[in-house]
Amino acid sequence: MTFARRGARTATVAKIGRDVRGEEMLRTLAKEGVVTRFIAKDPFRMSAYSVVILTPSGERAILTYRGAEKELAARDFPKSRLYARWFYLTHLSGKSAALFGTILRHAKAVGARVAVNPGKTQLRMPRHRLQPLLKLIDVFILNREEASYLTKVPYAREDAIFQKLDSWVPGIVAVTDGPGGVTVSDGSTRWSAGILKEKRHVDRTGAGDAFGSGFVTGLLERPGNIPYAIQLGSANATSVVEHIGAQEGILGKRDSILRWGRLRIREKRVSA
């Protein structure tokens, strides 16, 4: 939804059930200007949904039913009609996980760039299957715990984590660290920033996704400008934290990304 609100022509490929919840999803996406004709409908399973349990501090527990979402199959991925400048992949679970490589290879075949915010299913793939696919990724976004798990490098050894990730991913790697901010590397330069201070802390649901989509949107708006992408991603995440739910606070084209101030972004060269 971030891409559409920021003015990019956006479509989504997904699977929903033939139910009231699925129809509401379609209406919401259409209202935001997202093309929905590539969304498949499963006649046997309900649409995915989540129940979010919030604490007074804004932390939360999320109970998720994946439903039709995890049943996306090759027949639901219309390769002959999918052409874009960018593909943005998030968690593919269940049967849908089998499409991970298919989507990456299709994106490269049509000359698109690919951003991936992986889920547990992708992170748990056997190394010999995952590493060739990482070579197809232009922007890889994950949190520090996930980065430590994937690389098998202790959480505290940030430099070693990035050395491995940079050797696997030819493009940009962004590792978020909650209150610790974010570090981004393109293999030769590393950028680090803290976080923007929200005016009110309501709900952290969707903050990570908001950073990821905001970061990639920044690269669409200003190609190659990583500091701008970090600022936009951080502002988008901060805005989402100030609202209930994962969608309400997503920034639009006219929203200032400097509302919470300008991030101090540190830059340093790193050896290959």
Role assignments for model-derived ranges:
Residues A4-R5, L220:
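Gly/Ala-rich phosphate-binding loop of Rossmann-like dinucleotide-binding domains
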Residues A11, Y88, V114-A115, A174:
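Structural detector of well-ordered beta-strand residues that form the stable sheet scaffold
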Residues S96-I103:
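Active-site-adjacent beta->alpha loops and helix N-cap segments on the catalytic face
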Residues R5-L89, S256-A272:
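Conserved N-terminal subdomain of the carbohydrate kinase-like
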Residues Y155-A272:
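Conserved phosphate-binding/catalytic region of the ribokinase-like
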Residues L104-R105, V110-R113, G119-S192:
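Conserved phosphate/ATP/ADP-binding segment of small-molecule kinases
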Residues E69-F77, A98, L123-H128:
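Active-site glycine-rich loop that binds ribose-phosphate moieties when present
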Residues F3, N143, G208:
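Short, conserved phosphate/pyrophosphate- and ester-handling motifs at nucleotide-, phospho-/glycolipid
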